[in-house]
Amino acid sequence: MSSKQQAQGRNVVVIGTQWGDEGKGKVVDWLTDHAQAVVRFQGGHNAGHTLIIGDKKTILRLIPSGIMHKDVICYIGNGVVLSPEALFKEIGELEAAGLDVQSRLKISEATTLILPYHVAIDHAREKKRGEAKIGTTGRGIGPAYEDKVARRALRVQDLFYPEKFAEQLRENLEYHNFMLTNYYGAEPVNYEKTLAEAMSYAERLKPMVVDVSSALYAAEQAGQNLLFEGAQGTLLDIDHGTYPYVTSSNCVAGNAAAGSGVGPDSLQYILGITKAYCTRVGAGPFPSELYDHDNPARQDPIGVRLAEVGKEFGSVTGRPRRTGWLDAAALKRSIQINGLSGLCITKLDVLDGLETIRLCVGYNLDGKKLDVLPRGAESVARCEPIYEDFPGWKGTTFGIREWEKLPVEAQNFLRRIEEVAGKPIAMVSTGPERDETILLQHPFQD
């Protein structure tokens, strides 16, 4: 019996353990072969998941990666903030490539909408901050979450009640335009244009809108395997990340339940994705950093090499990523927060050819030794990394599919990561293609 015909389903959550960009899209794509549904539960179109299938590169920002598999249903949960404009742009790109999208995409009626004034606020705020800017993508994600918490957000279901929508939109714009013009010195957002654009999306969205919580419950009762796809990474989590240099949502495994409407007991296997090194986009502390394109003091040649070989540029923004050695002490913090079942190490091949490879196993902070990342950006910024050094390997790991075929030095490096982290490595990604993967423990199987 194939995994898609199991009588009893099993659910897997895929979480980034670093600052995002860990390679979750490729791993989700691989795991989707064993799932009937893929669920996005937080974030918006501020993070791109890059998939390479054959010679085709696809970047998904909002739609779950499972859309590339023709028999898989994709859900956007209540924890997501959704830009209708970005959604239909992405749908158009996928349909132009021959994919059936709208019959397989299901959107929660409780999903918060991103509207033009959220984008305007995002840009105006970053401009006013100047050198102290957070480094947002400028897509309105943060302001939309702010409206949600302030209980003034417009949600997908509101589009189907035009009079109520128009009234709430007018109130929202009175508030946001006051802030835009009087505090930020920016242009106001036009009410009539915003209303007309929003209403134009209502009928197009309606066939895709469902009660996602009930749909997922029914799928579980039918014995289906569900895959929950996280965006960003644990160290960008609004509560547990390097605050305030974080995103505006909870990126941790626990939010897979709240952000999609399932119970915590539905999250049976938590897979944490980590690169074999570290990257970060935008501002914020980074203890093991080697290279920052924008910082003349951070131009270590190995960091430059990691960026070039790893093609470390944001898939949505195109911004160069900062690079550094793998931080196992930060990984331990992610393991604590997420309750990880296993690890997936990605981009191991980027380390090929290095004479020495370093692993951060702790920090010196104000005269004390720590073995786990502290909380708060101020403390993290003062951390001095403690490294263990490992001999590199001469051969290539690119495309290897069996553990035994890895260079011994690579095996030793990976085993030490397991020891420091205290969790087993379930998978190793050795290239961008779906089948360039070493499987040690199958997340969908006991």
From Swiss-Prot:
EC number: 6.3.4.4
Family: Belongs to the adenylosuccinate synthetase family.
UniProt entry tagged with the keyword Membrane: no
Cited InterPro entries: Adenylosuccin_syn_GTP-bd (IPR018220), Adenylosuccin_syn_Lys_AS (IPR033128), Adenylosuccinate_synth_dom1 (IPR042109), Adenylosuccinate_synth_dom2 (IPR042110), Adenylosuccinate_synth_dom3 (IPR042111), Adenylosuccinate_synthetase (IPR001114), P-loop_NTPase (IPR027417)
Residue numbers binding Mg(2+): D21, G48
Originating organism: Polynucleobacter asymbioticus (strain DSM 18221 / CIP 109841 / QLW-P1DMWA-1) (Polynucleobacter necessarius subsp. asymbioticus)
Binding site for GTP: 20-26, 48-50, 321, 347-349, 429-431
One Pfam family of this chain: Adenylsucc_synt
Gene3D superfamilies associated with the record: Adenylosuccinate Synthetase, subunit A, domain 1, Adenylosuccinate Synthetase, subunit A, domain 2, Adenylosuccinate Synthetase, subunit A, domain 3
Source species taxonomy: Bacteria, Pseudomonadati, Pseudomonadota, Betaproteobacteria, Burkholderiales
Keywords recorded for this protein, A-Z: Cytoplasm, GTP-binding, Ligase, Magnesium, Metal-binding, Nucleotide-binding, Purine biosynthesis
GO cellular component: cytoplasm
Cofactor binding: number and manner: Binds 1 Mg(2+) ion per subunit.
UniProt-listed PANTHER family: ADENYLOSUCCINATE SYNTHETASE (PTHR11846:SF0)
Pathway annotation from the record: Purine metabolism; AMP biosynthesis via de novo pathway; AMP from IMP: step 1/2
Self-association state and partner proteins as the record states: Homodimer.
PROSITE patterns listed in its UniProt record: ADENYLOSUCCIN_SYN_1 (PS01266), ADENYLOSUCCIN_SYN_2 (PS00513)
Protein name (record): Adenylosuccinate synthetase
Function: Plays an important role in the de novo pathway of purine nucleotide biosynthesis. Catalyzes the first committed step in the biosynthesis of AMP from IMP.
Subcellular location: Cytoplasm
Cofactor(s) of this protein: Mg(2+)
